Amino acid sequence: MSLLLDANVWLAAADRDDAFHDAARRLVHSERIEHAALDLTVYEVGNVATRRWRDPERARRLCLLVLTACRERLVRIGADLAEEAVRIADGEQITVYDAAYVAAARRDGHVLISGDLRDLVERGLALPPDAAEA
């Protein structure tokens, strides 16, 4: 099974206070899953760990985890994906950033997993970490 994990999932796996910590950790460390992520996910997790958590070493480890786990499935943002993300964002009234995850998952046949309940999960655009099988 190929799962595209958004930044919320990678961060939840590293944050014991996150409601999805246990489920996200199982997903991130599962060897039965083909992990995928957007290339921008690396920067987002690094930014949160460095700026919000004030932990550059944790940021470095998280960035490497995403890069290692998604080695062959790190989705690069190109013109076609950006165009589709804008179309989805306009239609769903979500950010283009969130829509990029949706567009990549649809295009490449991944199941999108997100901790963003309001904008992605409740709209049926993604599954929460605790609904996916590790």
Regions found by a protein language model. Give the residues of each.
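Short, well-structured N-terminal submotif of metal-dependent ribonuclease cores
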Residues: 1-37, 52-61, 118, 134
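Acidic, PIN/NYN-like endoribonuclease modules and their adjacent C-terminal/linker elements
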Residues: 2, 75, 102-134
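Alpha-helix capping/helix-boundary segments
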Residues: 9, 41, 81, 101, ...
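A cross-family signal for key residues in well-ordered alpha-helices
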Residues: 11, 47, 103-106
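Internal, well-ordered alpha-helical scaffold/interface segments
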Residues: 22-25, 43-47
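Active-site-proximal, substrate-binding regions of enzyme catalytic domains
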Residues: 44-71
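Active-site neighborhoods of divalent-metal-dependent phosphate/nucleic-acid chemistry enzymes
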Residues: 72-115
